[in-house]
């Protein structure tokens, strides 16, 4: 479910990843609420994820979208369509492998990972999720991988080389 929002002249794309009904058991009985996981992006390299909990689904969604916009990160893309290099990441029990792909490959990913790539604007990528299929753990692992990812400029400065030497013949 993709929803486009036009706020502050920015084109945000929201994708609802999961909706769960959760229960709090109290002395007086059970209290039900909804927990929503949302991914928000501009399809140009910025993405964020957020969770929201409330007794009503609409209010939980608003909270989740606001949390996602606050947690936005910038991901540097190669040619505006794929990742610069392959990367592995782990969060709790969720492990993922993200691989850069040739033009025309498409998004080869399942479940929650696909939603992150769609709102991020990645066109060609291969991703594999192992061990856990919990959407929250998988998405957090993807964001951890994005945090560990280096742009060619960062790699070149670490190695003391020019960017053209690092990028080479791709």
From Swiss-Prot:
A biological process term (GO) from this entry: translation
Keywords of the record: Ribonucleoprotein, Ribosomal protein, RNA-binding, rRNA-binding
UniProt entry tagged with the keyword Ribonucleoprotein: yes
Record bears the keyword 4Fe-4S: no
SUPFAM superfamilies, A to Z: dsRNA-binding domain-like (SSF54768), Ribosomal protein S5 domain 2-like (SSF54211)
Family annotation (Pfam families): Ribosomal_S5 (PF00333), Ribosomal_S5_C (PF03719)
S5 DRBM domain mapped to chain residues: 12-75
GO cellular component terms, A-Z: small ribosomal subunit
Domain of life: Bacteria
Molecular function as annotated in GO: rRNA binding; structural constituent of ribosome
Domain notes for this protein: The N-terminal domain interacts with the head of the 30S subunit; the C-terminal domain interacts with the body and contacts protein S4. The interaction surface between S4 and S5 is involved in control of translational fidelity.
Function: With S4 and S12 plays an important role in translational accuracy. Located at the back of the 30S subunit body where it stabilizes the conformation of the head with respect to the body.
HAMAP family: Ribosomal_uS5_B (MF_01307_B)
Assembly, per entry: Part of the 30S ribosomal subunit. Contacts proteins S4 and S8.
Family: Belongs to the universal ribosomal protein uS5 family.
Protein's name according to its UniProt entry: Small ribosomal subunit protein uS5
Organism of provenance: Wolbachia sp. subsp. Brugia malayi (strain TRS)
Origin organism lineage: Bacteria, Pseudomonadati, Pseudomonadota, Alphaproteobacteria, Rickettsiales
Gene name, Swiss-Prot/TrEMBL: rpsE
């Amino acid at each position: 479910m993709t929803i486009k929002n036009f706020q502050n002249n920015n084109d945000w794309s929201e994708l609802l990843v999961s909706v769960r009904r959760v229960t709090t058991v109290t002395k007086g009985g059970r209290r039900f609420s909804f927990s929503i996981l949302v991914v928000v992006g501009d399809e140009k390299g910025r993405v964020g994820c957020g969770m929201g909990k409330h007794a009503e689904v609409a209010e939980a969604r608003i909270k989740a979208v606001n949390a996602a916009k606050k947690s936005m990160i910038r991901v540097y893309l190669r040619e505006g369509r794929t990742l610069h290099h392959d990367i592995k990441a782990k969060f709790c029990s969720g492990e993922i492998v993200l691989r850069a792909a040739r033009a025309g490959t498409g998004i080869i990913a399942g479940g929650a990972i696909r939603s992150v790539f769609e709102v991020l604007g990645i066109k060609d990528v291969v991703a594999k999720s192992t061990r856990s299929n919990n959407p929250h753990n998988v998405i957090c692992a993807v964001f951890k991988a994005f945090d560990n990812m280096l742009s060619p400029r960062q790699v070149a400065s670490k190695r003391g080389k020019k960017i053209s030497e690092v990028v080479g013949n791709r």
